[in-house]
Every structure is written in C-alpha cells, then in structure tokens.
Amino acid sequence: MLALLCASLMFAPSLDAQTRKTTPKKAPAKTTKKAPAPIVSRIQAEWKCPSELGQGVATGRRFCDVLTARDPKDGILITVPPHRGPVKLIFELHNRHTYSAELIKQKQAYRKYTATIGVLSMDNTLVDRAVVQSEFRTEKDLFDRISGGAGPGGVKAVAPTGDEFITIELPATVVDQVSVLGEKLSVVRPDGTDNFTTTGRPIATISNVMLEFTPAPAPAAPKKAPVRQ
C-alpha cells in the first residue's frame, strides 16, 4: 500500500505537466513611424507701398495708406514666396484720422470711420474683403502718431486710429503677389455723414504685414553627367 502511494506521487507532476495548456507568446505590435509635420514659416512680408504714411512714434512700425483703386497694380503689392498649399496673409488694419486739438476743445472732433478694403490676386480676382470700424473722440483714441510732420513734437496731423487684426487665406494658386486695394469709406461726423469711393483716395492704413505658409520643397539637384571614359 505504501509502495502504491509513493508511485502515484512520483507520476503526479508529470501527468499535470501533460494536461497543462501553454499560452503562445504574442508577437510584438508593429509600430509605424508618423510622417513629420510640415514646417510652417511665419515671416514679415516684403511689400511695395504706393502711398507711405510714415513710421509710428510709439510702435516704430511702417504704416502704408490703402488707396481706392480698381487695378491691382495700383494697390499695396505684397510678395508671396514659393510655398506649398494655401498661405495666410496677416496684417493690422487701421482707420485714418486728421487730428485737431481745436476741434476737441470745441467738442466737434467726434468721428466714426468704417473702411472696406479688398485683397486681390494680380489677375483681378477678389480673394477676400476686410473692414475696420472705429470711433474717435480724444487723442487717446489714436493708435499711434506718425513722425516727420510739422505739428507739436514733430508728428503729422494724420494718424492711425482703431486696430483690426486681419487674417486672409490666399489659395495655393497665388504664386507671386497679391494687392490690397481700398473700396469705400464712411465717415460719421456730428453734423452728417460722408461716403467716399473716388479712385486714388486714402481710406485706411495697414501695418505689421506677415505671411504664414509651408515653404515649397527645395528643387532637386541636377543629375551629374556620366563620366566619359
């Protein structure tokens, strides 16, 4: 009886090993490398201004007047560098005000300006419009003063007022330049309202012009000519 019990104990582990199921090891999951995100550049734009207002005293910015016109060649020309996909045109749009301390004393200085401008491609296709509206009551409502004038402190009477941050998406098909043109201006005064659409009139001013885009890939290097033997 004792011998039979010992024999059963000796064979029990081997029987257990035969009946135990082994779980196969899982293969490691395959990892795919993500493509790197495209590099986006944000630069100060190169632009040609047909009507310079001047340099700001407080900001040091270049201010350029937006003229009413119909031909894109007569507008503010902004260079668009080589790119892939759409481009964001970013700038700040201001109204123009002729400052008069005398009108402020007389409580006749109030103005409400609404200026509408357009951004066009060079084939005269409208990309988008932008509007800036602001009110002037006192000198504190001026965005900046412009240096180089005959007024007190050497500043010009005309100054930017109001500030609208504008972002316009240019389609990928725009490859060289865009033009900023004025469309119309409404001025509300204490004694009435004036509307201006005549060609060649400055109706607004812009500053801080930037471009945001994905640069075009570098051109492929030319293939080397085979060496003659």
Regions found by a protein language model. Name each.
Residues 83-91, 167-187:
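Noncatalytic modules at the cell exterior or secretory-pathway interfaces
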Residues 54-67, 128-172, 187-190:
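Extended, solvent-exposed segments with strong compositional bias
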Residues 103-115:
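Short coil-to-beta strand junction motifs in C2/discoidin
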Residues 184-229:
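Surface-exposed edge beta-strand/loop patches
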Residues 2-12:
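Bacterial N-terminal signal peptides
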Residues 26, 30-71:
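N-terminal leader/pro-regions and domain N-caps
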Residues 75-105:
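Contiguous beta-strand segments within globular domains
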Residues 11, 15-42, 218-229:
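Compositionally biased, proline/threonine/alanine/serine-rich low-complexity intrinsically disordered stretches
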